[in-house]
Amino acid sequence: MARLFGTDGVRGIANYDLTPQLAFELGRAGAYVLTHGTHRPKVVVGKDSRISGDMLECALTAGLTSVGAEVISVGIIPTPAVAYLTRLYQADAGVMISASHNPVEYNGIKFFDKDGYKLPDEVEDRIENIIKEKIELPSPIGTGIGTRKEYTNSHRDYIEFLKSTIDGDLKGMKIVIDCAYGASSTIAPILFKELGAEVILHGAEPIGEKINVNCGSTHPEKLQQLVIENGADIGLAFDGDADRLIAVDEKGNVVDGDHIMAICAIDLKKKGRLKNNTVVATVMSNIGFEIALKEQGINLIRTKVGDRYVLEEMTKGGYSIGGEQSGHIIFLDDNTTGDGEITALKLCSISKESGKKLSELAACMITYPQVLINAKVKNELKNAYLEDEEIKREIENLEREMRGEGRVLIRPSGTEPLVRVMVEGKDYDKISQMAKELAELIERKLN
Protein backbone atom coordinates (compact mmCIF):
# COMPACT_ATOMS: atom_id res chain seq x y z
CA MET A 1 0.00 0.00 0.00
CA ALA A 2 1.45 3.39 -1.05
CA ARG A 3 1.95 6.19 1.47
CA LEU A 4 -1.32 8.01 2.17
CA PHE A 5 0.14 11.41 3.05
CA GLY A 6 1.83 13.48 0.36
CA THR A 7 3.48 16.89 0.67
CA ASP A 8 0.11 18.52 1.43
CA GLY A 9 -2.03 15.98 3.26
CA VAL A 10 -3.97 13.10 1.70
CA ARG A 11 -5.09 13.82 -1.84
CA GLY A 12 -6.65 11.92 -4.74
CA ILE A 13 -9.72 11.49 -6.92
CA ALA A 14 -12.75 11.72 -4.62
CA ASN A 15 -14.75 8.49 -4.18
CA TYR A 16 -11.97 6.56 -5.95
CA ASP A 17 -8.65 7.23 -4.19
CA LEU A 18 -10.09 9.32 -1.38
CA THR A 19 -13.17 7.33 -0.35
CA PRO A 20 -15.67 8.00 2.44
CA GLN A 21 -14.22 4.96 4.25
CA LEU A 22 -10.73 6.47 4.15
CA ALA A 23 -12.08 9.85 5.32
CA PHE A 24 -13.78 8.07 8.25
CA GLU A 25 -10.55 6.29 9.19
CA LEU A 26 -8.54 9.52 8.90
CA GLY A 27 -10.99 11.22 11.25
CA ARG A 28 -10.70 8.48 13.87
CA ALA A 29 -6.93 8.11 13.68
CA GLY A 30 -6.25 11.85 13.39
CA ALA A 31 -8.32 12.81 16.43
CA TYR A 32 -6.72 10.06 18.50
CA VAL A 33 -3.12 10.90 17.56
CA LEU A 34 -3.50 14.67 17.94
CA THR A 35 -4.88 14.36 21.48
CA HIS A 36 -2.73 11.33 22.39
CA GLY A 37 -6.02 9.65 23.34
CA THR A 38 -6.00 11.58 26.64
CA HIS A 39 -9.16 13.70 26.38
CA ARG A 40 -12.23 14.51 24.29
CA PRO A 41 -10.83 16.21 21.17
CA LYS A 42 -12.13 19.53 19.83
CA VAL A 43 -11.67 19.73 16.04
CA VAL A 44 -12.39 22.54 13.53
CA VAL A 45 -13.52 21.24 10.11
CA GLY A 46 -13.71 23.37 6.95
CA LYS A 47 -13.96 22.67 3.22
CA ASP A 48 -13.74 24.32 -0.18
CA SER A 49 -16.66 24.34 -2.62
CA ARG A 50 -16.02 21.15 -4.61
CA ILE A 51 -19.01 18.82 -4.89
CA SER A 52 -17.36 15.90 -3.06
CA GLY A 53 -16.86 18.10 0.01
CA ASP A 54 -20.21 17.23 1.62
CA MET A 55 -19.66 13.50 1.20
CA LEU A 56 -16.16 13.60 2.68
CA GLU A 57 -17.13 15.98 5.48
CA CYS A 58 -19.92 13.63 6.59
CA ALA A 59 -17.55 10.65 6.62
CA LEU A 60 -14.72 12.56 8.32
CA THR A 61 -17.10 13.92 10.96
CA ALA A 62 -18.44 10.41 11.61
CA GLY A 63 -14.87 9.24 12.20
CA LEU A 64 -14.07 12.15 14.50
CA THR A 65 -17.23 11.84 16.59
CA SER A 66 -16.83 8.04 16.83
CA VAL A 67 -13.77 8.59 19.05
CA GLY A 68 -15.59 11.23 21.09
CA ALA A 69 -14.52 14.41 19.26
CA GLU A 70 -16.48 17.64 19.41
CA VAL A 71 -16.57 18.85 15.79
CA ILE A 72 -16.82 22.54 14.98
CA SER A 73 -18.08 22.81 11.38
CA VAL A 74 -17.14 26.14 9.76
CA GLY A 75 -18.48 25.39 6.26
CA ILE A 76 -16.96 26.59 2.98
CA ILE A 77 -13.98 28.66 4.03
CA PRO A 78 -10.31 29.14 3.00
CA THR A 79 -7.64 26.72 4.22
CA PRO A 80 -5.75 29.44 6.16
CA ALA A 81 -9.00 30.31 7.95
CA VAL A 82 -9.08 26.79 9.40
CA ALA A 83 -5.51 27.26 10.67
CA TYR A 84 -6.46 30.58 12.29
CA LEU A 85 -9.80 29.41 13.73
CA THR A 86 -8.17 26.32 15.26
CA ARG A 87 -6.07 28.71 17.36
CA LEU A 88 -8.90 31.16 18.01
CA TYR A 89 -11.30 28.45 19.24
CA GLN A 90 -8.52 26.72 21.22
CA ALA A 91 -9.20 23.46 19.39
CA ASP A 92 -6.94 20.41 19.47
CA ALA A 93 -6.80 20.21 15.69
CA GLY A 94 -8.12 21.60 12.43
CA VAL A 95 -9.00 19.69 9.27
CA MET A 96 -9.44 21.16 5.79
CA ILE A 97 -11.17 19.23 3.01
CA SER A 98 -9.71 20.60 -0.23
CA ALA A 99 -7.53 19.77 -3.21
CA SER A 100 -6.36 23.38 -3.55
CA HIS A 101 -5.68 24.23 -7.23
CA ASN A 102 -6.44 20.70 -8.54
CA PRO A 103 -9.43 19.93 -10.84
CA VAL A 104 -12.93 19.34 -9.45
CA GLU A 105 -12.71 15.52 -9.40
CA TYR A 106 -9.90 15.68 -6.84
CA ASN A 107 -10.19 16.33 -3.13
CA GLY A 108 -7.93 16.13 -0.12
CA ILE A 109 -7.81 16.06 3.68
CA LYS A 110 -5.23 18.15 5.48
CA PHE A 111 -4.66 18.34 9.24
CA PHE A 112 -3.45 21.24 11.38
CA ASP A 113 -2.21 20.92 14.95
CA LYS A 114 -3.58 22.99 17.86
CA ASP A 115 -1.28 25.89 16.94
CA GLY A 116 -2.47 25.98 13.32
CA TYR A 117 0.62 24.38 11.77
CA LYS A 118 0.59 21.59 9.19
CA LEU A 119 1.61 18.28 10.72
CA PRO A 120 5.25 17.14 10.63
CA ASP A 121 6.01 13.86 8.82
CA GLU A 122 6.34 11.84 12.03
CA VAL A 123 2.81 12.75 13.21
CA GLU A 124 1.34 11.93 9.78
CA ASP A 125 3.21 8.61 9.93
CA ARG A 126 1.53 7.76 13.26
CA ILE A 127 -1.92 8.50 11.81
CA GLU A 128 -1.10 6.45 8.73
CA ASN A 129 0.23 3.55 10.80
CA ILE A 130 -3.04 3.28 12.76
CA ILE A 131 -4.98 3.04 9.48
CA LYS A 132 -2.64 0.62 7.70
CA GLU A 133 -2.12 -1.67 10.69
CA LYS A 134 -5.84 -1.53 11.54
CA ILE A 135 -5.01 -0.65 15.14
CA GLU A 136 -8.11 -0.74 17.33
CA LEU A 137 -9.07 2.61 18.86
CA PRO A 138 -11.51 3.35 21.70
CA SER A 139 -15.17 3.48 20.64
CA PRO A 140 -17.11 5.37 23.31
CA ILE A 141 -20.84 4.82 23.78
CA GLY A 142 -23.68 6.89 25.21
CA THR A 143 -22.62 10.38 26.25
CA GLY A 144 -19.02 9.57 25.30
CA ILE A 145 -19.85 9.86 21.57
CA GLY A 146 -18.87 13.21 20.05
CA THR A 147 -21.15 15.85 18.56
CA ARG A 148 -21.08 18.30 15.66
CA LYS A 149 -21.85 22.00 15.94
CA GLU A 150 -22.05 24.60 13.17
CA TYR A 151 -20.30 27.86 14.04
CA THR A 152 -22.18 30.50 12.04
CA ASN A 153 -19.84 33.33 13.08
CA SER A 154 -16.64 31.74 11.74
CA HIS A 155 -16.55 33.77 8.53
CA ARG A 156 -16.98 37.01 10.46
CA ASP A 157 -14.25 35.98 12.91
CA TYR A 158 -11.84 35.38 10.03
CA ILE A 159 -12.78 38.60 8.18
CA GLU A 160 -12.13 40.70 11.31
CA PHE A 161 -8.77 38.96 11.77
CA LEU A 162 -7.84 39.68 8.14
CA LYS A 163 -8.66 43.37 8.55
CA SER A 164 -6.26 43.51 11.50
CA THR A 165 -3.31 42.44 9.32
CA ILE A 166 -3.06 45.82 7.54
CA ASP A 167 -3.16 49.45 8.65
CA GLY A 168 -5.86 51.62 7.14
CA ASP A 169 -8.33 50.84 4.36
CA LEU A 170 -8.47 50.40 0.59
CA LYS A 171 -10.76 53.34 -0.26
CA GLY A 172 -10.17 54.73 -3.74
CA MET A 173 -8.90 51.44 -5.18
CA LYS A 174 -10.65 49.58 -7.99
CA ILE A 175 -9.98 45.85 -7.63
CA VAL A 176 -11.02 42.86 -9.77
CA ILE A 177 -11.20 39.62 -7.77
CA ASP A 178 -11.28 36.09 -9.20
CA CYS A 179 -12.39 33.64 -6.49
CA ALA A 180 -12.07 30.54 -8.75
CA TYR A 181 -15.63 29.53 -7.67
CA GLY A 182 -13.90 28.35 -4.50
CA ALA A 183 -13.53 29.04 -0.81
CA SER A 184 -12.55 32.72 -1.14
CA SER A 185 -16.07 33.37 -2.53
CA THR A 186 -17.34 33.40 1.05
CA ILE A 187 -14.71 35.88 2.27
CA ALA A 188 -13.03 38.12 -0.34
CA PRO A 189 -16.09 40.00 -1.71
CA ILE A 190 -17.19 41.01 1.80
CA LEU A 191 -13.66 41.77 3.02
CA PHE A 192 -12.60 44.08 0.20
CA LYS A 193 -15.95 45.91 0.05
CA GLU A 194 -15.87 46.53 3.81
CA LEU A 195 -12.37 47.97 3.42
CA GLY A 196 -13.80 50.53 0.98
CA ALA A 197 -12.54 49.22 -2.36
CA GLU A 198 -14.62 49.29 -5.53
CA VAL A 199 -14.86 45.58 -6.32
CA ILE A 200 -15.53 43.76 -9.60
CA LEU A 201 -16.07 40.02 -9.11
CA HIS A 202 -15.46 36.92 -11.20
CA GLY A 203 -16.04 33.32 -10.08
CA ALA A 204 -17.32 34.65 -6.77
CA GLU A 205 -19.91 31.97 -6.01
CA PRO A 206 -18.93 28.69 -4.34
CA ILE A 207 -19.94 26.47 -7.27
CA GLY A 208 -18.25 23.09 -6.88
CA GLU A 209 -18.58 22.02 -10.51
CA LYS A 210 -16.69 25.13 -11.69
CA ILE A 211 -13.88 25.29 -9.12
CA ASN A 212 -10.54 26.15 -10.81
CA VAL A 213 -12.02 25.65 -14.31
CA ASN A 214 -10.38 28.29 -16.54
CA CYS A 215 -10.22 30.66 -13.61
CA GLY A 216 -8.27 31.40 -10.44
CA SER A 217 -4.54 31.60 -9.85
CA THR A 218 -3.65 28.92 -12.43
CA HIS A 219 -5.76 30.51 -15.21
CA PRO A 220 -5.54 34.33 -14.87
CA GLU A 221 -6.49 35.10 -18.50
CA LYS A 222 -10.07 36.23 -17.74
CA LEU A 223 -8.80 38.32 -14.83
CA GLN A 224 -6.27 40.06 -17.11
CA GLN A 225 -9.08 40.90 -19.53
CA LEU A 226 -11.37 42.23 -16.78
CA VAL A 227 -8.64 44.44 -15.27
CA ILE A 228 -8.05 46.15 -18.63
CA GLU A 229 -11.78 46.41 -19.53
CA ASN A 230 -12.63 48.01 -16.17
CA GLY A 231 -9.54 50.22 -15.84
CA ALA A 232 -8.82 48.58 -12.49
CA ASP A 233 -5.80 49.25 -10.28
CA ILE A 234 -5.14 45.60 -9.57
CA GLY A 235 -6.48 42.09 -10.15
CA LEU A 236 -6.38 39.33 -7.54
CA ALA A 237 -6.67 35.61 -8.38
CA PHE A 238 -7.07 33.00 -5.64
CA ASP A 239 -6.99 29.23 -6.05
CA GLY A 240 -9.74 26.86 -4.88
CA ASP A 241 -8.89 27.03 -1.17
CA ALA A 242 -7.40 30.57 -1.19
CA ASP A 243 -4.01 29.66 0.24
CA ARG A 244 -2.27 31.21 -2.76
CA LEU A 245 -2.53 34.43 -4.77
CA ILE A 246 -1.46 35.57 -8.21
CA ALA A 247 -1.95 39.27 -9.05
CA VAL A 248 -2.44 41.24 -12.27
CA ASP A 249 -1.19 44.82 -12.65
CA GLU A 250 -3.15 47.72 -14.17
CA LYS A 251 -1.67 46.95 -17.61
CA GLY A 252 -2.90 43.34 -17.52
CA ASN A 253 0.46 41.75 -16.74
CA VAL A 254 0.66 38.77 -14.37
CA VAL A 255 2.55 39.43 -11.13
CA ASP A 256 3.67 36.07 -9.74
CA GLY A 257 4.69 34.94 -6.26
CA ASP A 258 8.33 35.95 -6.74
CA HIS A 259 7.36 39.54 -7.58
CA ILE A 260 4.82 39.69 -4.74
CA MET A 261 7.40 38.42 -2.22
CA ALA A 262 9.97 40.94 -3.48
CA ILE A 263 7.48 43.84 -3.17
CA CYS A 264 6.41 42.78 0.33
CA ALA A 265 9.95 42.03 1.57
CA ILE A 266 11.23 45.43 0.42
CA ASP A 267 8.27 47.10 2.16
CA LEU A 268 8.88 45.13 5.38
CA LYS A 269 12.55 46.16 5.33
CA LYS A 270 11.64 49.85 4.90
CA LYS A 271 9.36 49.55 7.94
CA GLY A 272 12.01 47.71 9.99
CA ARG A 273 9.87 44.57 10.20
CA LEU A 274 11.82 42.14 8.00
CA LYS A 275 13.05 39.73 10.65
CA ASN A 276 16.74 38.82 10.37
CA ASN A 277 16.74 40.68 7.02
CA THR A 278 15.89 37.40 5.27
CA VAL A 279 13.33 35.90 2.88
CA VAL A 280 12.77 32.14 2.47
CA ALA A 281 11.85 30.71 -0.96
CA THR A 282 12.23 27.43 -2.84
CA VAL A 283 14.81 26.42 -5.42
CA MET A 284 12.23 27.28 -8.12
CA SER A 285 12.22 31.03 -7.43
CA ASN A 286 13.78 32.93 -10.32
CA ILE A 287 17.40 34.16 -10.17
CA GLY A 288 15.95 37.63 -10.87
CA PHE A 289 14.21 37.43 -7.49
CA GLU A 290 17.51 36.63 -5.78
CA ILE A 291 19.26 39.52 -7.56
CA ALA A 292 16.45 41.98 -6.68
CA LEU A 293 16.72 41.08 -2.98
CA LYS A 294 20.51 41.31 -3.08
CA GLU A 295 20.29 44.83 -4.52
CA GLN A 296 18.20 45.78 -1.47
CA GLY A 297 20.63 44.12 0.95
CA ILE A 298 18.18 41.30 1.73
CA ASN A 299 19.31 37.70 2.22
CA LEU A 300 17.60 34.74 0.52
CA ILE A 301 17.46 31.18 1.87
CA ARG A 302 16.30 28.50 -0.58
CA THR A 303 14.54 25.24 0.34
CA LYS A 304 13.19 22.16 -1.43
CA VAL A 305 9.96 22.62 -3.41
CA GLY A 306 6.89 22.74 -1.13
CA ASP A 307 5.51 25.38 1.21
CA ARG A 308 5.96 23.00 4.18
CA TYR A 309 9.75 23.20 3.71
CA VAL A 310 9.55 26.99 3.47
CA LEU A 311 7.60 27.07 6.73
CA GLU A 312 10.07 24.74 8.47
CA GLU A 313 12.95 27.06 7.56
CA MET A 314 10.97 30.14 8.61
CA THR A 315 10.13 28.76 12.05
CA LYS A 316 13.68 27.50 12.55
CA GLY A 317 15.27 30.86 11.68
CA GLY A 318 12.55 33.17 13.00
CA TYR A 319 11.86 34.77 9.59
CA SER A 320 8.73 36.79 8.79
CA ILE A 321 8.13 36.14 5.07
CA GLY A 322 8.61 33.22 2.72
CA GLY A 323 6.86 31.45 -0.11
CA GLU A 324 6.75 30.05 -3.60
CA GLN A 325 6.66 31.39 -7.14
CA SER A 326 3.18 29.82 -7.44
CA GLY A 327 1.79 32.38 -4.97
CA HIS A 328 1.88 30.41 -1.70
CA ILE A 329 3.18 33.17 0.57
CA ILE A 330 3.51 32.92 4.34
CA PHE A 331 3.48 35.99 6.58
CA LEU A 332 4.44 34.23 9.79
CA ASP A 333 3.73 37.25 12.00
CA ASP A 334 0.09 36.96 10.90
CA ASN A 335 -0.73 33.32 10.13
CA THR A 336 0.87 29.88 10.29
CA THR A 337 0.33 28.90 6.67
CA GLY A 338 0.13 30.42 3.19
CA ASP A 339 -2.80 32.86 3.11
CA GLY A 340 -3.97 34.32 -0.21
CA GLU A 341 -6.27 36.87 1.44
CA ILE A 342 -3.49 38.25 3.67
CA THR A 343 -1.13 38.40 0.68
CA ALA A 344 -3.77 40.28 -1.33
CA LEU A 345 -4.33 42.77 1.49
CA LYS A 346 -0.60 43.41 1.95
CA LEU A 347 -0.12 43.99 -1.79
CA CYS A 348 -3.08 46.37 -2.12
CA SER A 349 -2.09 48.21 1.05
CA ILE A 350 1.50 48.74 -0.19
CA SER A 351 0.18 50.10 -3.50
CA LYS A 352 -2.16 52.53 -1.74
CA GLU A 353 0.36 53.66 0.90
CA SER A 354 3.15 54.23 -1.62
CA GLY A 355 0.95 55.85 -4.25
CA LYS A 356 2.56 53.54 -6.80
CA LYS A 357 0.79 51.42 -9.38
CA LEU A 358 1.40 47.67 -9.18
CA SER A 359 3.45 47.75 -12.41
CA GLU A 360 5.82 50.27 -10.79
CA LEU A 361 6.17 48.14 -7.65
CA ALA A 362 6.73 44.96 -9.70
CA ALA A 363 9.57 46.68 -11.59
CA CYS A 364 11.75 46.03 -8.51
CA MET A 365 12.45 42.63 -10.07
CA ILE A 366 13.27 41.41 -13.57
CA THR A 367 12.33 37.81 -14.38
CA TYR A 368 15.27 36.17 -16.11
CA PRO A 369 14.69 33.75 -19.01
CA GLN A 370 14.49 30.11 -17.94
CA VAL A 371 15.10 26.97 -20.01
CA LEU A 372 14.05 23.51 -18.80
CA ILE A 373 15.21 20.31 -20.53
CA ASN A 374 14.54 16.73 -19.42
CA ALA A 375 17.47 14.31 -19.53
CA LYS A 376 16.35 10.67 -19.77
CA VAL A 377 18.07 8.69 -17.01
CA LYS A 378 17.19 5.32 -15.44
CA ASN A 379 15.41 5.64 -12.10
CA GLU A 380 18.21 3.95 -10.16
CA LEU A 381 20.78 6.42 -11.57
CA LYS A 382 18.84 9.68 -11.17
CA ASN A 383 20.95 10.89 -8.23
CA ALA A 384 24.30 9.73 -9.63
CA TYR A 385 25.01 13.21 -11.08
CA LEU A 386 25.90 14.26 -7.53
CA GLU A 387 28.94 11.95 -7.62
CA ASP A 388 30.06 12.43 -11.22
CA GLU A 389 33.11 14.74 -11.30
CA GLU A 390 32.72 15.76 -14.96
CA ILE A 391 29.06 16.77 -14.47
CA LYS A 392 29.87 18.67 -11.27
CA ARG A 393 32.76 20.45 -13.00
CA GLU A 394 30.55 21.43 -15.96
CA ILE A 395 27.89 22.91 -13.65
CA GLU A 396 30.58 24.95 -11.84
CA ASN A 397 31.97 26.17 -15.19
CA LEU A 398 28.53 27.27 -16.41
CA GLU A 399 27.75 29.19 -13.22
CA ARG A 400 31.19 30.82 -13.29
CA GLU A 401 30.56 31.88 -16.90
CA MET A 402 27.28 33.57 -15.88
CA ARG A 403 29.07 35.60 -13.17
CA GLY A 404 26.27 35.68 -10.63
CA GLU A 405 23.62 36.58 -13.23
CA GLY A 406 22.37 33.06 -13.81
CA ARG A 407 22.18 29.62 -12.24
CA VAL A 408 21.91 25.92 -12.95
CA LEU A 409 19.43 23.69 -11.12
CA ILE A 410 19.34 19.90 -11.45
CA ARG A 411 16.25 18.10 -10.10
CA PRO A 412 15.61 14.35 -10.44
CA SER A 413 11.93 13.68 -11.19
CA GLY A 414 10.05 12.08 -8.33
CA THR A 415 7.84 10.00 -10.64
CA GLU A 416 9.59 9.50 -14.00
CA PRO A 417 13.01 8.27 -15.25
CA LEU A 418 14.13 11.86 -15.84
CA VAL A 419 16.57 14.43 -14.51
CA ARG A 420 15.31 17.99 -15.05
CA VAL A 421 18.00 20.45 -16.15
CA MET A 422 17.06 24.10 -15.58
CA VAL A 423 19.26 27.03 -16.57
CA GLU A 424 18.42 30.70 -15.92
CA GLY A 425 20.29 33.72 -17.24
CA LYS A 426 20.06 36.98 -19.16
CA ASP A 427 20.60 35.62 -22.69
CA TYR A 428 17.93 33.10 -23.77
CA ASP A 429 19.89 31.69 -26.72
CA LYS A 430 22.99 31.23 -24.58
CA ILE A 431 21.21 29.45 -21.72
CA SER A 432 19.29 27.26 -24.21
CA GLN A 433 22.60 26.00 -25.56
CA MET A 434 23.98 25.53 -22.03
CA ALA A 435 20.92 23.50 -20.94
CA LYS A 436 20.99 21.35 -24.09
CA GLU A 437 24.69 20.51 -23.72
CA LEU A 438 24.39 19.80 -19.99
CA ALA A 439 21.36 17.51 -20.52
CA GLU A 440 23.28 15.64 -23.23
CA LEU A 441 26.28 15.25 -20.91
CA ILE A 442 24.06 13.87 -18.12
CA GLU A 443 22.40 11.38 -20.49
CA ARG A 444 25.78 10.28 -21.85
CA LYS A 445 27.45 9.87 -18.47
CA LEU A 446 24.55 8.26 -16.57
CA ASN A 447 23.25 5.76 -19.14
Swiss-Prot record:
It is an enzyme of class 5 (isomerase). Its cofactor is Mg(2+). Binds 1 Mg(2+) ion per subunit. Pfam families: PGM_PMM_I, PGM_PMM_II, PGM_PMM_III, PGM_PMM_IV. NCBIfam families: glmM, PRK10887.1. Belongs to the phosphohexose mutase family. PANTHER family: PHOSPHOGLUCOMUTASE (ALPHA-D-GLUCOSE-1,6-BISPHOSPHATE-DEPENDENT), PHOSPHOHEXOSE MUTASE. This is Phosphoglucosamine mutase.
